[in-house]
């Protein structure tokens, strides 16, 4: 495939650019991960599904991708929550990491190439801070905390397109007496009694949030890498501060391209615990199948806001079922690919090569689904070839990962075990020649949208 014509929006330049990796056919990508003080919410799902689609597409296009997604496992929020729960930070972190991995797996998010924890990279953070101090970009305050000297970095604000002087005038940053400037940010924080701490030249403490990502990306991807990704809420100050630290320390460009995913709104309002419209991924998955949630979150262009609402999720559910129904009762066979199948794949590539335009890519999938449905009764050979292509392109987006019949069995709140019990009762009723009861059970299930199919080997069921 042609590597030359992929374009996407670079937050650093503020415009779409042709993608040119540092090393031919290879991509080094860093995505800011979760601070594991609580359960992952729907905003996390949005971000990591967006970048999972991009990761999958890069691989589909033939790139060798190294994706680093970190875990922030030491932070003020983690310490505060552990104290509130009466548990150690280790207990809190390990439980939340397991929960994160569980929900990400349910949403079919691929594991990153590497998943470093902040606490595993302390020596590298200390080394970076020492370099910044030597170069005059950092200083130790009166209370021994170490701060980054923002005014020393001439390009501060280049990612967020903000002027440092204007930021200082409108600053709402809490005034800390030992700071030279209100915009200076902490690189190393001295530990209070009872808090987790690591030795450093400045005393026992822990790293600031921003230096963690700079050190982890440097360790695993080098001084300069291709793509840095994260939620749009991290653009300032987190990503701006990462650039300031890394470029001052390494004296070279930090990341060539910056991708930012759009935020989730709930019924057109900002998602917030105070507005009581905050949903964890687990809560959403209690109501909707992972296929539906993933489709919904992948169906909007990655950098646009997305509105979480029951109506939009129901629309996503209907769309998923349309795609699954097209693949029902047809075996995908690669060798049966029709000659004109390449036209569909080319349209899919054209959409995704243009800033990962998933809505346009999905439109291609629905055109394929329509073609399959038309051919099912007239040319199953050709339909099976199109079905193979539909499966292939769905895999690129990470959708339709569930067995078709298993998906339909889980729909509309139908309890599979209860259905199986009723089928067993119906089978026994037929053996006893109690056909009235057998018909009652069939009708009962039919009202729930469950279709029974009898054969010589027994009875199977599916959601209609």
From Swiss-Prot:
Its EC number is 6.1.1.16. GO terms for biological process: cysteinyl-tRNA aminoacylation. GO terms for cellular component: cytosol. InterPro entries: Cys-tRNA-ligase, Cys-tRNA-synt_Ia_DALR, Cys-tRNA/MSH_ligase, CysS_C, Rossmann-like_a/b/a_fold, tRNA-synt_1_cat_dom, tRNAsynth_Ia_anticodon-bd. A motif ('HIGH' region) lies at residues 34-44. Its cofactor is Zn(2+). Its main location: cytoplasm. Gene3D superfamilies: Cysteine-tRNA ligase, C-terminal anti-codon recognition domain, HUPs. Zn(2+) binds at residues 32, 213, 238, 242. A motif ('KMSKS' region) lies at residues 270-274. It is found in: Cytoplasm. Monomer. PANTHER family: CYSTEINE--TRNA LIGASE, CYTOPLASMIC, CYSTEINYL-TRNA SYNTHETASE. Belongs to the class-I aminoacyl-tRNA synthetase family. This is Cysteine--tRNA ligase. It comes from Francisella tularensis subsp. tularensis (strain SCHU S4 / Schu 4). The lineage of its organism: Bacteria, Pseudomonadati, Pseudomonadota, Gammaproteobacteria, Thiotrichales.
């Amino acid at each position: 495939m042609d590597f030359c014509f992929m374009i996407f929006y670079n937050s650093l330049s503020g415009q779409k650019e042709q993608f040119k990796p540092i090393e031919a056919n290879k991509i080094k990508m860093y995505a800011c991960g979760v601070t594991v003080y609580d359960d992952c919410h729907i905003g996390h799902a949005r971000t990591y599904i967006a970048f999972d689609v991009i990761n999958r597409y890069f691989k589909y296009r033939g790139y060798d991708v190294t994706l680093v997604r970190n875990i922030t496992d030491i932070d003020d929020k983690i310490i505060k929550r552990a104290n509130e729960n009466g548990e150690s930070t280790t207990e809190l972190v390990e439980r939340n990491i397991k929960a994160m991995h569980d929900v990400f797996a349910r949403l079919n998010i691929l594991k990153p190439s590497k998943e470093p924890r902040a606490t595993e990279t302390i020596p590298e953070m200390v080394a970076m801070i020492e370099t910044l101090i030597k170069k005059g970009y950092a200083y130790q305050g009166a209370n021994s905390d170490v701060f980054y000297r923002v005014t020393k970095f001439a390009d501060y604000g280049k990612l967020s397109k903000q002027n440092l002087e204007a930021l200082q005038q409108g600053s709402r940053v809490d005034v800390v007496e030992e700071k030279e400037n209100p915009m200076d940010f902490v690189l190393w924080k001295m530990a209070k009694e009872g808090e987790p701490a690591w030795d450093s030249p400045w005393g026992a403490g822990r790293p600031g949030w921003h230096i963690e990502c700079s050190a982890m990306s440097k360790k695993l991807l080098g001084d300069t890498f291709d793509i840095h990704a994260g939620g749009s809420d991290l653009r300032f100050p987190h990503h701006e501060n990462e650039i300031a630290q890394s470029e001052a320390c390494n004296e070279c460009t930090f990341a060539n391209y910056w991708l930012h995913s759009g935020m989730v709104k709930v019924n057109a309002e900002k998602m917030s615990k105070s507005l009581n419209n905050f949903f964890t991924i687990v809560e959403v998955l209690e109501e909707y199948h992972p296929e539906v949630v993933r489709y919904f979150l992948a169906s909007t262009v990655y950098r646009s806001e997305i509105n979480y609402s029951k109506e939009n999720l129901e629309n996503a559910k209907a769309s998923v079922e349309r795609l699954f129904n097209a693949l029902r009762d047809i075996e995908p066979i690669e060798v049966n690919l029709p000659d004109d199948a390449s036209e569909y794949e080319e349209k899919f590539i054209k959409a995704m090569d243009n800033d990962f335009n998933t809505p346009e890519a999905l439109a291609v999938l629905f055109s394929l689904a329509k073609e399959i449905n038309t051919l099912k009764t007239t040319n199953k050979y050709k339909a099976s070839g199109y079905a193979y292509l539909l499966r292939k392109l769905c895999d690129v987006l990470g959708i339709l990962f569930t067995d078709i019949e298993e998906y339909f069995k889980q729909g509309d709140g139908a309890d599979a075990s209860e259905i199986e019990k009723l089928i067993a009762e119906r089978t026994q009723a037929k053996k006893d020649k109690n056909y009235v009861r057998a018909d009652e059970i069939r009708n009962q299930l039919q009202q729930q949208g469950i279709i029974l199919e009898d054969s010589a080997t027994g009875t199977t069921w599916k959601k209609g």
